[in-house]
């Protein structure tokens, strides 16, 4: 097969795709993946598919899967050229969803798409993904890096994550045991986490704030990019030691939209917003965006990243266990009987 001599010889690189850069990235990230390896991994990076043996000791194992991204928090990371923690966010958004069902995360895969591959940026992001997997106790077994010129501007990139976990069928947490009198425990968030960033960026824009301006012990931009807290290990230990009726990951929609997802029809959640500390970052966002407090609570986590619902007689033990595991915890409310004319979530003490 011969090439025509009267036309320039084109390569994939001429079209904007650098195979060598992709290969260099794979070499850079092998260590990050290897550091997360669980004993059940049979084959990880490099193959067409990762192989993972089911952990032993389960009578009726159920696999739980989830996928998520980090939304427009990515734009903030690119704007600040700070890419070392956005991978932690990606893992957190997936594994925190799995633990809500009582599932232990087993393995994780990522998808990284960009217009022009920067090996340094991508390697930094994937190293963060590895750190997130280590925090969650799951293995980074593979992923896809897609260089797509014309689809993304320059070295802009997008991320998606995919995670699979496992839970004993008889121990699935589905909210069916929730009953009036149960206690709601809130686990403190580490910041805005990974939801509401379109509003965050709009507030920064209209307020004229500088991302490099001081904010507490950091800058405003650094405070906004604080990585999402991963709650997996403390919650797995809690589930082993005390009854848990429901868990709710407080993501987009805040307490108002996420608590109803785990409540049976007869139950409503009554949350005292004065029972937990509102981080100053949320006060800053509310003030500078003139955002109604009800809108704040249906957009942001407002300081509570995960809610645990436990029987009243287990509340003290749960608070003690979570605190001993390093979590900042608050007794934020209780479950009451719900009637049709009432909201499913009542925020006591909310003043607009």
From Swiss-Prot:
GO terms for cellular component: cytosol. InterPro entries: PurM-like_C_dom, PurM-like_C_sf, PurM-like_N, PurM-like_N_sf, PurM_cligase. GO terms for molecular function: ATP binding; phosphoribosylamine-glycine ligase activity; phosphoribosylformylglycinamidine cyclo-ligase activity. CDD domains: PurM. Its EC number is 6.3.3.1. Keywords: ATP-binding, Cytoplasm, Ligase, Nucleotide-binding, Purine biosynthesis. Pfam families: AIRS (PF00586), AIRS_C (PF02769). Gene3D superfamilies: PurM-like C-terminal domain (3.90.650.10), PurM-like, N-terminal domain (3.30.1330.10). It is found in: Cytoplasm. Pathway: Purine metabolism; IMP biosynthesis via de novo pathway; 5-amino-1-(5-phospho-D-ribosyl)imidazole from N(2)-formyl-N(1)-(5-phospho-D-ribosyl)glycinamide: step 2/2. It is an enzyme of class 6 (ligase). It catalyses: 2-formamido-N(1)-(5-O-phospho-beta-D-ribosyl)acetamidine + ATP = 5-amino-1-(5-phospho-beta-D-ribosyl)imidazole + ADP + phosphate + H(+). Transmembrane segments: none annotated. HAMAP family: AIRS (MF_00741). PANTHER family: TRIFUNCTIONAL PURINE BIOSYNTHETIC PROTEIN ADENOSINE-3, TRIFUNCTIONAL PURINE BIOSYNTHETIC PROTEIN ADENOSINE-3-RELATED. Belongs to the AIR synthase family. This is Phosphoribosylformylglycinamidine cyclo-ligase. It comes from Hahella chejuensis (strain KCTC 2396).
């Amino acid at each position: 097969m011969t090439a025509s001599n009267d036309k320039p010889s084109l390569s994939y690189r001429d079209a904007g795709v650098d195979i060598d850069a992709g290969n260099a990235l794979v070499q850079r990230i092998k260590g990050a993946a290897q550091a997360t390896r669980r004993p059940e991994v049979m084959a990880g990076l490099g193959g067409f598919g990762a192989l993972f043996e089911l952990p032993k000791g389960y009578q009726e194992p159920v696999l739980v899967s989830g996928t998520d991204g980090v939304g427009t928090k990515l734009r903030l990371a690119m704007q600040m050229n700070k890419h070392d923690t956005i991978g932690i966010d990606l893992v957190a958004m997936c594994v925190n969803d799995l633990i809500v069902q009582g599932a232990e995360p087993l393995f994780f895969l990522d998808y990284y798409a960009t217009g022009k591959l920067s090996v340094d940026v991508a390697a930094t992001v994937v190293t963060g993904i590895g750190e997130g997997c280590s925090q969650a106790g799951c293995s980074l077994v593979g992923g896809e890096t897609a260089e797509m010129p014309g689809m993304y501007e320059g070295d802009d990139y997008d991320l998606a994550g995919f995670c699979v976990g496992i839970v004993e069928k008889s121990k699935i947490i589905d909210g069916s045991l929730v009953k009036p009198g149960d206690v709601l425990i809130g686990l403190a968030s580490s910041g805005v986490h990974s939801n509401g960033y379109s509003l965050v960026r709009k507030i920064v824009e209209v307020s004229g704030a500088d991302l490099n301006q001081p904010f507490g012990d950091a800058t405003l931009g650094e405070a906004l990019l604080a990585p999402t807290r991963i709650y997996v290990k403390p919650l797995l230990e809690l589930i082993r030691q005390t009854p848990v009726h429901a868990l709710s990951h407080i993501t987009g929609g805040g307490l108002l939209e996420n608590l109803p997802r785990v409540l049976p029809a007869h139950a409503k959640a009554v949350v005292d917003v004065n029972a937990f500390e509102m981080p100053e970052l949320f006060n800053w966002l509310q003030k500078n965006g003139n955002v109604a407090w009800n809108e704040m609570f249906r957009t942001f986590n407002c300081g509570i990243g995960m809610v645990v619902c436990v029987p009243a007689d287990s509340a003290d033990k749960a608070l003690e266990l979570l605190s001993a595991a390093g979590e900042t915890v608050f007794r934020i409310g209780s479950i009451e009987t719900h009637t049709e004319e009432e909201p499913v979530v009542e925020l006591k003490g909310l003043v607009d």
